[in-house]
Amino acid sequence: MSHSTLTARREFLKFLAASPYVAAFGGVAAFVQEGVLAQGAQEAADVIADPARAITVFDFEEAAHRKVLPGHWAYMVSGVDDDGTIRANREAFRQVQLRPRRLRDATKVDIRVELFGTTYNSPIFLCPTGGEKGFHPDGELAVARAAKARGTLQFLSTSTSTSVEEVNRALGRPVWYQFYAPSSWGACEQMLRRVEAAGCSVVALTVDNTTGRLSETYLRTRPKDLQQCAACHQGEPGAASSYLTRPMYQGVNMAGALRQDPAMDWAFVDRLRRFWRGKLIIKGLDTREDARLCLEHGIDGILVSNHGGRATETLRATLEALPEVVAAVNGRIPVYVDGGFRRGADVFKALALGAKAVGIGRPFLWGLGAFGQAGVDRVLEILQGELRLAMGNCGTQSVAEITHAYVATPNWKI
Protein backbone atom coordinates (compact mmCIF):
# COMPACT_ATOMS: atom_id res chain seq x y z
CA MET A 1 0.00 0.00 0.00
CA SER A 2 1.45 3.39 -1.03
CA HIS A 3 2.20 6.19 1.41
CA SER A 4 -0.41 8.45 -0.26
CA THR A 5 -3.08 5.77 0.10
CA LEU A 6 -2.22 5.28 3.76
CA THR A 7 -2.40 9.03 4.38
CA ALA A 8 -5.76 9.37 2.64
CA ARG A 9 -7.21 6.49 4.63
CA ARG A 10 -5.90 7.94 7.89
CA GLU A 11 -7.44 11.36 7.20
CA PHE A 12 -10.79 9.81 6.28
CA LEU A 13 -10.87 7.77 9.49
CA LYS A 14 -9.99 10.86 11.52
CA PHE A 15 -12.83 12.76 9.84
CA LEU A 16 -15.30 10.02 10.74
CA ALA A 17 -14.02 9.81 14.30
CA ALA A 18 -14.58 13.56 14.77
CA SER A 19 -18.07 13.53 13.31
CA PRO A 20 -20.92 14.24 15.81
CA TYR A 21 -23.13 11.88 13.83
CA VAL A 22 -20.73 8.99 14.30
CA ALA A 23 -20.27 9.92 17.96
CA ALA A 24 -24.00 9.50 18.50
CA PHE A 25 -23.61 5.79 17.87
CA GLY A 26 -21.19 4.41 20.45
CA GLY A 27 -20.51 1.09 18.72
CA VAL A 28 -19.80 2.74 15.39
CA ALA A 29 -17.62 5.37 17.02
CA ALA A 30 -15.60 2.69 18.79
CA PHE A 31 -15.21 0.80 15.52
CA VAL A 32 -13.96 3.92 13.75
CA GLN A 33 -11.58 4.72 16.60
CA GLU A 34 -10.17 1.19 16.36
CA GLY A 35 -9.63 1.86 12.67
CA VAL A 36 -7.69 5.03 13.45
CA LEU A 37 -5.48 3.16 15.91
CA ALA A 38 -4.95 0.26 13.54
CA GLN A 39 -4.10 2.62 10.69
CA GLY A 40 -1.59 4.42 12.88
CA ALA A 41 -0.02 1.13 13.83
CA GLN A 42 0.21 0.09 10.19
CA GLU A 43 1.94 3.33 9.25
CA ALA A 44 4.35 3.08 12.18
CA ALA A 45 5.15 -0.51 11.35
CA ASP A 46 6.81 -0.05 7.98
CA VAL A 47 8.57 -3.30 7.17
CA ILE A 48 11.65 -3.36 9.34
CA ALA A 49 15.09 -3.76 7.77
CA ASP A 50 16.90 -4.25 11.07
CA PRO A 51 15.78 -6.44 14.00
CA ALA A 52 16.80 -3.69 16.40
CA ARG A 53 13.91 -1.59 15.03
CA ALA A 54 11.30 -4.13 16.12
CA ILE A 55 9.04 -2.99 18.94
CA THR A 56 6.89 -6.12 19.17
CA VAL A 57 7.23 -9.60 17.71
CA PHE A 58 4.55 -8.71 15.15
CA ASP A 59 7.07 -6.42 13.46
CA PHE A 60 8.89 -9.51 12.19
CA GLU A 61 5.87 -11.05 10.47
CA GLU A 62 5.81 -8.99 7.27
CA ALA A 63 9.60 -8.84 7.13
CA ALA A 64 9.67 -12.64 7.09
CA HIS A 65 6.75 -12.84 4.66
CA ARG A 66 8.76 -10.90 2.08
CA LYS A 67 11.76 -13.23 2.32
CA VAL A 68 10.32 -16.72 2.82
CA LEU A 69 9.20 -18.72 -0.21
CA PRO A 70 5.40 -18.84 -0.71
CA GLY A 71 4.87 -22.50 0.09
CA HIS A 72 7.14 -22.33 3.12
CA TRP A 73 5.33 -19.23 4.34
CA ALA A 74 1.98 -20.98 3.94
CA TYR A 75 3.32 -23.96 5.88
CA MET A 76 4.41 -21.65 8.69
CA VAL A 77 1.28 -19.56 9.10
CA SER A 78 -1.58 -21.87 8.17
CA GLY A 79 -3.55 -24.21 10.39
CA VAL A 80 -6.06 -26.87 9.40
CA ASP A 81 -9.50 -26.65 7.84
CA ASP A 82 -10.73 -23.05 8.34
CA ASP A 83 -7.84 -22.02 10.63
CA GLY A 84 -10.36 -21.56 13.43
CA THR A 85 -8.17 -23.07 16.14
CA ILE A 86 -5.37 -20.64 15.33
CA ARG A 87 -7.82 -17.79 15.88
CA ALA A 88 -9.18 -19.39 19.06
CA ASN A 89 -5.67 -19.59 20.52
CA ARG A 90 -5.26 -15.83 20.16
CA GLU A 91 -8.79 -14.83 21.15
CA ALA A 92 -8.53 -16.66 24.48
CA PHE A 93 -6.01 -14.14 25.82
CA ARG A 94 -8.58 -11.35 25.54
CA GLN A 95 -10.85 -13.27 27.89
CA VAL A 96 -8.31 -13.41 30.72
CA GLN A 97 -7.84 -10.21 32.69
CA LEU A 98 -4.90 -9.24 34.87
CA ARG A 99 -5.45 -8.43 38.56
CA PRO A 100 -2.39 -6.35 39.48
CA ARG A 101 -1.35 -5.84 43.09
CA ARG A 102 -0.05 -2.36 43.77
CA LEU A 103 2.53 -0.81 46.08
CA ARG A 104 4.99 -3.65 45.72
CA ASP A 105 8.71 -3.36 45.09
CA ALA A 106 9.39 -3.92 41.39
CA THR A 107 13.08 -3.00 41.33
CA LYS A 108 14.23 -6.62 41.12
CA VAL A 109 12.13 -8.80 38.83
CA ASP A 110 13.61 -12.27 38.26
CA ILE A 111 12.17 -14.23 35.32
CA ARG A 112 14.46 -17.25 35.66
CA VAL A 113 12.94 -20.70 36.03
CA GLU A 114 14.22 -24.20 36.77
CA LEU A 115 13.01 -27.03 34.52
CA PHE A 116 14.01 -30.60 35.35
CA GLY A 117 17.01 -29.37 37.31
CA THR A 118 18.33 -26.89 34.74
CA THR A 119 17.99 -23.13 35.19
CA TYR A 120 16.90 -21.06 32.19
CA ASN A 121 16.82 -17.29 31.91
CA SER A 122 13.07 -17.21 31.39
CA PRO A 123 10.04 -19.53 31.28
CA ILE A 124 9.73 -18.91 27.53
CA PHE A 125 10.92 -21.82 25.38
CA LEU A 126 11.25 -22.41 21.65
CA CYS A 127 8.80 -24.99 20.34
CA PRO A 128 9.79 -27.79 17.97
CA THR A 129 9.16 -26.81 14.35
CA GLY A 130 10.19 -28.97 11.44
CA GLY A 131 12.57 -28.03 8.65
CA GLU A 132 13.74 -24.62 9.85
CA LYS A 133 16.18 -24.35 6.94
CA GLY A 134 13.06 -23.78 4.87
CA PHE A 135 12.84 -20.34 6.48
CA HIS A 136 16.53 -19.42 6.61
CA PRO A 137 19.70 -21.19 5.37
CA ASP A 138 21.08 -21.45 8.92
CA GLY A 139 17.87 -23.03 10.19
CA GLU A 140 18.05 -24.75 13.55
CA LEU A 141 21.65 -23.64 14.12
CA ALA A 142 20.62 -19.98 14.02
CA VAL A 143 17.84 -20.75 16.48
CA ALA A 144 20.23 -22.65 18.75
CA ARG A 145 22.75 -19.82 18.81
CA ALA A 146 20.06 -17.31 19.72
CA ALA A 147 18.72 -19.65 22.39
CA LYS A 148 22.21 -20.01 23.83
CA ALA A 149 22.70 -16.24 23.92
CA ARG A 150 19.37 -15.77 25.73
CA GLY A 151 19.65 -18.79 28.04
CA THR A 152 16.52 -20.29 26.50
CA LEU A 153 15.23 -23.86 26.32
CA GLN A 154 15.06 -25.20 22.77
CA PHE A 155 12.96 -28.13 21.61
CA LEU A 156 14.11 -29.95 18.48
CA SER A 157 11.67 -31.60 16.10
CA THR A 158 12.05 -35.09 14.72
CA SER A 159 11.52 -33.34 11.37
CA THR A 160 14.52 -31.08 11.94
CA SER A 161 16.65 -30.13 8.95
CA THR A 162 19.78 -30.22 11.15
CA SER A 163 21.00 -33.15 13.22
CA VAL A 164 20.55 -33.26 16.97
CA GLU A 165 24.31 -33.53 17.42
CA GLU A 166 24.96 -30.30 15.50
CA VAL A 167 22.19 -28.41 17.27
CA ASN A 168 23.39 -29.51 20.71
CA ARG A 169 26.88 -28.26 19.90
CA ALA A 170 25.54 -24.88 18.78
CA LEU A 171 23.25 -24.62 21.81
CA GLY A 172 25.93 -25.63 24.29
CA ARG A 173 23.59 -28.04 26.08
CA PRO A 174 21.10 -30.73 25.04
CA VAL A 175 17.80 -29.83 23.46
CA TRP A 176 14.53 -31.35 24.58
CA TYR A 177 13.68 -33.76 21.78
CA GLN A 178 10.20 -33.82 20.26
CA PHE A 179 9.47 -37.38 19.16
CA TYR A 180 7.23 -38.51 16.32
CA ALA A 181 6.98 -42.24 16.98
CA PRO A 182 7.27 -44.32 13.79
CA SER A 183 4.99 -47.33 13.38
CA SER A 184 8.03 -49.64 13.72
CA TRP A 185 9.24 -50.14 17.29
CA GLY A 186 12.69 -50.95 15.96
CA ALA A 187 12.80 -47.54 14.29
CA CYS A 188 11.71 -45.92 17.57
CA GLU A 189 14.56 -47.60 19.44
CA GLN A 190 17.14 -46.63 16.83
CA MET A 191 16.15 -42.97 16.87
CA LEU A 192 15.93 -42.72 20.66
CA ARG A 193 19.30 -44.40 21.17
CA ARG A 194 20.82 -41.75 18.94
CA VAL A 195 19.05 -38.98 20.86
CA GLU A 196 20.30 -40.41 24.16
CA ALA A 197 23.85 -40.74 22.82
CA ALA A 198 23.71 -37.07 21.83
CA GLY A 199 23.15 -36.21 25.49
CA CYS A 200 19.41 -35.52 25.47
CA SER A 201 17.58 -36.47 28.65
CA VAL A 202 14.08 -35.15 27.87
CA VAL A 203 11.80 -36.54 25.17
CA ALA A 204 8.36 -35.17 24.31
CA LEU A 205 6.13 -37.72 22.60
CA THR A 206 3.73 -35.95 20.23
CA VAL A 207 0.27 -37.51 20.23
CA ASP A 208 -2.04 -34.95 18.60
CA ASN A 209 -1.38 -35.57 14.92
CA THR A 210 -1.15 -39.32 14.37
CA THR A 211 -3.65 -39.52 11.48
CA GLY A 212 -2.58 -36.48 9.48
CA ARG A 213 -4.33 -33.19 8.79
CA LEU A 214 -5.93 -31.07 6.08
CA SER A 215 -3.79 -27.96 5.73
CA GLU A 216 -5.73 -26.19 3.00
CA THR A 217 -3.67 -23.01 2.64
CA TYR A 218 -0.40 -24.91 2.58
CA LEU A 219 -1.58 -27.52 0.09
CA ARG A 220 -2.85 -24.85 -2.32
CA THR A 221 0.35 -22.81 -2.13
CA ARG A 222 3.01 -25.53 -2.00
CA PRO A 223 3.12 -26.24 -5.77
CA LYS A 224 4.45 -22.72 -6.34
CA ASP A 225 7.70 -23.74 -4.66
CA LEU A 226 8.39 -27.07 -6.31
CA GLN A 227 10.78 -25.65 -8.91
CA GLN A 228 12.78 -23.77 -6.28
CA CYS A 229 13.08 -26.26 -3.44
CA ALA A 230 12.09 -29.72 -4.61
CA ALA A 231 14.24 -31.33 -1.92
CA CYS A 232 11.82 -30.04 0.71
CA HIS A 233 8.80 -31.72 -0.82
CA GLN A 234 9.63 -35.33 -1.61
CA GLY A 235 6.80 -37.82 -1.60
CA GLU A 236 3.23 -37.35 -0.46
CA PRO A 237 2.50 -35.22 2.62
CA GLY A 238 2.54 -37.32 5.77
CA ALA A 239 4.15 -40.37 4.18
CA ALA A 240 7.39 -41.65 5.62
CA SER A 241 9.06 -41.12 2.24
CA SER A 242 8.65 -37.35 2.68
CA TYR A 243 11.04 -37.40 5.61
CA LEU A 244 13.61 -40.08 4.86
CA THR A 245 16.15 -37.48 3.78
CA ARG A 246 15.83 -35.59 7.08
CA PRO A 247 18.83 -35.98 9.42
CA MET A 248 17.05 -37.80 12.25
CA TYR A 249 15.93 -40.58 9.92
CA GLN A 250 19.45 -41.31 8.72
CA GLY A 251 20.50 -44.77 9.89
CA VAL A 252 16.96 -45.60 10.99
CA ASN A 253 15.30 -48.59 9.33
CA MET A 254 11.99 -47.11 8.17
CA ALA A 255 11.21 -49.90 5.70
CA GLY A 256 7.44 -50.28 5.60
CA ALA A 257 7.02 -47.87 8.51
CA LEU A 258 4.85 -44.80 8.78
CA ARG A 259 6.32 -41.59 10.13
CA GLN A 260 3.72 -41.61 12.91
CA ASP A 261 1.98 -44.67 14.26
CA PRO A 262 -1.83 -44.33 13.99
CA ALA A 263 -2.20 -47.32 16.33
CA MET A 264 -0.31 -45.60 19.15
CA ASP A 265 -2.08 -46.04 22.50
CA TRP A 266 -1.32 -46.14 26.23
CA ALA A 267 0.24 -49.59 25.84
CA PHE A 268 2.76 -47.97 23.49
CA VAL A 269 3.35 -45.24 26.08
CA ASP A 270 4.09 -47.91 28.69
CA ARG A 271 6.57 -49.57 26.36
CA LEU A 272 8.23 -46.23 25.65
CA ARG A 273 8.32 -45.44 29.36
CA ARG A 274 10.15 -48.72 30.07
CA PHE A 275 12.66 -48.08 27.28
CA TRP A 276 13.42 -44.38 27.76
CA ARG A 277 15.51 -43.74 30.86
CA GLY A 278 15.20 -39.95 30.83
CA LYS A 279 12.28 -37.63 31.39
CA LEU A 280 9.22 -38.33 29.26
CA ILE A 281 6.68 -35.64 28.38
CA ILE A 282 3.44 -36.11 26.47
CA LYS A 283 2.86 -33.29 23.99
CA GLY A 284 -0.62 -32.59 22.65
CA LEU A 285 -3.00 -33.35 25.54
CA ASP A 286 -5.76 -30.94 26.51
CA THR A 287 -8.21 -32.81 28.78
CA ARG A 288 -8.27 -33.76 32.45
CA GLU A 289 -9.01 -37.38 31.56
CA ASP A 290 -5.78 -37.78 29.60
CA ALA A 291 -3.86 -35.79 32.20
CA ARG A 292 -4.90 -38.26 34.90
CA LEU A 293 -3.84 -41.14 32.68
CA CYS A 294 -0.40 -39.55 32.43
CA LEU A 295 -0.10 -39.87 36.19
CA GLU A 296 -1.10 -43.53 36.04
CA HIS A 297 1.46 -44.28 33.34
CA GLY A 298 4.48 -42.62 34.93
CA ILE A 299 4.78 -39.59 32.66
CA ASP A 300 7.06 -36.80 33.89
CA GLY A 301 5.30 -33.81 32.34
CA ILE A 302 2.54 -32.63 30.01
CA LEU A 303 2.74 -30.09 27.21
CA VAL A 304 -0.76 -28.73 26.61
CA SER A 305 -0.72 -28.10 22.88
CA ASN A 306 -2.93 -28.16 19.82
CA HIS A 307 0.04 -28.03 17.46
CA GLY A 308 -0.42 -24.30 17.00
CA GLY A 309 -3.84 -24.98 15.50
CA ARG A 310 -2.25 -27.32 12.97
CA ALA A 311 -3.53 -30.73 14.09
CA THR A 312 -7.26 -30.95 14.83
CA GLU A 313 -9.79 -28.15 14.31
CA THR A 314 -10.96 -28.28 17.93
CA LEU A 315 -11.70 -24.54 18.10
CA ARG A 316 -10.51 -24.77 21.71
CA ALA A 317 -7.61 -22.63 22.85
CA THR A 318 -4.76 -24.18 24.77
CA LEU A 319 -5.06 -21.37 27.32
CA GLU A 320 -8.62 -22.54 27.95
CA ALA A 321 -7.56 -26.17 28.29
CA LEU A 322 -4.65 -25.38 30.59
CA PRO A 323 -6.55 -24.93 33.91
CA GLU A 324 -8.29 -28.29 33.77
CA VAL A 325 -5.04 -30.12 33.01
CA VAL A 326 -3.26 -28.29 35.83
CA ALA A 327 -6.08 -29.15 38.23
CA ALA A 328 -6.06 -32.80 37.18
CA VAL A 329 -2.36 -33.36 37.94
CA ASN A 330 -2.56 -31.28 41.15
CA GLY A 331 1.12 -30.38 41.19
CA ARG A 332 2.42 -33.93 40.82
CA ILE A 333 4.05 -33.26 37.45
CA PRO A 334 4.82 -30.00 35.60
CA VAL A 335 2.49 -28.70 32.92
CA TYR A 336 3.78 -26.69 29.97
CA VAL A 337 1.74 -24.93 27.28
CA ASP A 338 2.07 -23.46 23.80
CA GLY A 339 -0.30 -22.02 21.23
CA GLY A 340 -0.81 -18.41 20.20
CA PHE A 341 1.60 -16.68 22.56
CA ARG A 342 2.69 -13.31 21.18
CA ARG A 343 3.11 -11.06 24.23
CA GLY A 344 4.88 -11.17 27.56
CA ALA A 345 1.47 -10.57 29.15
CA ASP A 346 0.22 -13.73 27.40
CA VAL A 347 3.03 -15.65 29.06
CA PHE A 348 2.18 -14.12 32.44
CA LYS A 349 -1.44 -15.27 32.09
CA ALA A 350 -0.41 -18.85 31.36
CA LEU A 351 1.97 -18.88 34.32
CA ALA A 352 -0.84 -17.59 36.52
CA LEU A 353 -3.05 -20.43 35.29
CA GLY A 354 -0.46 -22.98 36.36
CA ALA A 355 1.94 -23.46 33.46
CA LYS A 356 5.56 -24.12 34.41
CA ALA A 357 6.86 -22.73 31.11
CA VAL A 358 5.43 -21.37 27.87
CA GLY A 359 6.38 -22.16 24.28
CA ILE A 360 6.47 -19.93 21.22
CA GLY A 361 6.53 -21.10 17.62
CA ARG A 362 5.57 -18.72 14.82
CA PRO A 363 7.09 -15.60 16.44
CA PHE A 364 10.61 -17.02 16.47
CA LEU A 365 10.10 -18.38 12.96
CA TRP A 366 9.18 -14.87 11.84
CA GLY A 367 12.42 -13.66 13.37
CA LEU A 368 14.35 -16.50 11.76
CA GLY A 369 12.83 -15.95 8.33
CA ALA A 370 13.45 -12.21 8.46
CA PHE A 371 16.94 -11.99 9.96
CA GLY A 372 18.26 -15.41 10.97
CA GLN A 373 19.89 -15.65 14.39
CA ALA A 374 19.59 -11.91 15.02
CA GLY A 375 15.85 -12.07 14.44
CA VAL A 376 15.31 -14.96 16.84
CA ASP A 377 17.47 -13.22 19.43
CA ARG A 378 15.43 -10.02 19.18
CA VAL A 379 12.12 -11.92 19.44
CA LEU A 380 13.32 -13.49 22.67
CA GLU A 381 14.60 -10.16 23.96
CA ILE A 382 11.24 -8.51 23.31
CA LEU A 383 9.16 -11.23 24.95
CA GLN A 384 11.44 -11.50 27.96
CA GLY A 385 11.29 -7.74 28.37
CA GLU A 386 7.50 -7.72 28.12
CA LEU A 387 7.27 -10.48 30.70
CA ARG A 388 9.40 -8.45 33.11
CA LEU A 389 7.09 -5.49 32.58
CA ALA A 390 3.97 -7.58 33.21
CA MET A 391 5.47 -9.11 36.35
CA GLY A 392 6.64 -5.78 37.72
CA ASN A 393 3.36 -4.03 37.00
CA CYS A 394 1.40 -6.86 38.60
CA GLY A 395 3.55 -6.83 41.73
CA THR A 396 5.47 -10.09 41.32
CA GLN A 397 9.24 -10.34 41.70
CA SER A 398 9.69 -13.96 40.63
CA VAL A 399 7.94 -16.53 38.47
CA ALA A 400 7.14 -18.54 41.60
CA GLU A 401 5.04 -15.63 42.91
CA ILE A 402 2.71 -15.68 39.89
CA THR A 403 -0.52 -17.43 40.91
CA HIS A 404 -4.15 -17.61 39.85
CA ALA A 405 -4.81 -14.64 42.13
CA TYR A 406 -3.29 -12.36 39.49
CA VAL A 407 -5.86 -13.16 36.78
CA ALA A 408 -9.62 -13.17 36.36
CA THR A 409 -10.91 -15.87 34.03
CA PRO A 410 -14.23 -16.70 32.37
CA ASN A 411 -16.13 -19.85 33.22
CA TRP A 412 -14.11 -22.42 31.29
CA LYS A 413 -15.22 -25.41 33.33
CA ILE A 414 -16.24 -28.57 31.48
What are these regions (language model features)?
Residues I124-C127, Q154-L156, V175-Y177, V203, ...:
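Hydrophobic faces of well-ordered beta-strands that scaffold small-molecule active sites
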Residues A44-G117, S215, K224-M264, A400-I402, ...:
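An N-cap/entry alpha-helix motif that binds or orients negatively charged groups
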Residues S2-P20:
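N-terminal secretory signal peptides and thylakoid transit peptides that target proteins
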